[in-house]
Amino acid sequence: MEIIRAQAKDVDLIAPLFNAYRQFYKAPSDVESSRQFIFERLTKDESVIFLAMEDDRALGFVQLYPLFASVALQSLWLLNDLFVDSAARNQGVGEALMKRAEQFAHETGSRGLFLRTATDNFPAQKLYEKCGWVRDETFYRYDKILR
């Protein structure tokens, strides 16, 4: 398995995985919109995507968005999306993607990474804790959905 940094030319490898990821969170299937969304993020340099590959087959991806910690005066990365194809689960793909994201944060001089996950997504929580992530017990999260 190889972890590569995705480029716009890789969009057709990522789109089916991204569509499946969205379906996991109960969004309707829409491969073309998924493809367009990923293409825009990559061509506009709005996100960084790492792709797990094996024999020209995409196994999973992690997508990071840049943010800033104002008080710390440093950058950080939002690990917004992590998905592994069902046929490739329990083979270390998710862990390899998490490690590559962490390595990238180090390479960019970032303060760190953060993520959020569904409270009932126990497999993901187990993976994050295995990779050394700590659940925040200090801060509340607030959302205001506009549309």
For the regions a protein language model found, what residue spans apply to each?
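A short helix-loop-beta-strand connector motif used in the catalytic cores of GNAT acetyltransferases and
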Residues: 39-51, 78
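A short beta-loop-alpha structural element at the N-terminal edge
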Residues: 2-16
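Conserved GNAT-fold acetyl-CoA-binding loop/helix
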Residues: 15-40
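Conserved acetyl-CoA binding element of GNAT-fold acetyltransferases
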Residues: 75-86
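Conserved acetyl-CoA-binding loop-helix of GNAT-fold acetyltransferases
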Residues: 84, 90-103, 130
